[in-house]
Regions:
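Bacterial N-terminal signal peptides
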Residues: 7-15
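Short, solvent-exposed mixed-charge patches
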Residues: 140-143
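N-terminal secretory signal peptides
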Residues: 31-65
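N-terminal helix-cap/turn-to-beta initiation motif at the start of protein domains
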Residues: 20-36
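Positively charged n-region of N-terminal signal peptides that target proteins for export
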Residues: 1-4
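Contiguous, well-ordered beta-strand patches that form the walls/edges
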Residues: 40-43, 60-126
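Short amphipathic beta-strand/extended segments with alternating polar/hydrophobic composition
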Residues: 48, 66-71, 132-138
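Secreted/processed peptides and extracellular or luminal domains of membrane proteins
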Residues: 50, 102-103, 129, 137
Length: 143
């Protein structure tokens, strides 16, 4: 019985550890806040709540998802911030594109901010060849 309880406790701790980002963004990171993306040629909008604790809340169409993320403190020589994001919760409903995101999905993107810090684009790599956006800042972290 004791071995079963120990195994169960270990499993719970391991699952919780997976939800904690290894590196939280610095307190004045430009990613922090609420960002809006109007999906082209649709009436659909995505909202990204980028929190100081390294978690996000994203709404896209009927989808509501939560993730953990890590973003570089400083941009690369090319001006991009490397961002890794992993889905930890999802309501299983379709996003603006009709897709359903699976829990555990992880992506790495490269973010480039406008000099005003109020707009950004999200790119597949450190170039402007495959990006989406712009996303517009709505307010601070708590909004």
């Amino acid at each position: 019985m004791r071995a079963v309880l120990l195994a169960a406790a270990t499993a719970v701790v391991a699952s919780l550890a997976g939800a904690v980002p290894p590196h939280k963004p610095k307190t004045n990171h430009p990613i922090l806040g609420t960002w809006i993306f109007a999906v082209p040629e649709t009436d659909c909008e995505e909202t990204y709540y980028m929190r100081q604790d390294g978690t996000t809340l994203v709404t896209s169409g009927a989808e509501v998802a939560e993730s953990v993320y890590e973003i570089d403190d400083e941009p690369t020589a090319k001006g991009f911030y490397r961002n890794t994001d992993r889905i930890v919760k999802d309501n299983g409903k379709p996003d603006c594109g009709g897709g359903i995101t699976k829990i555990g999905t992880q992506v790495t993107n490269y973010i480039r901010f406008h000099p005003s810090w109020n707009m950004m684009i999200i790119c597949r790599d450190e170039s402007l060849d495959a990006c989406f956006g712009p996303l517009y800042r709505l307010g601070g972290e708590s909004s």
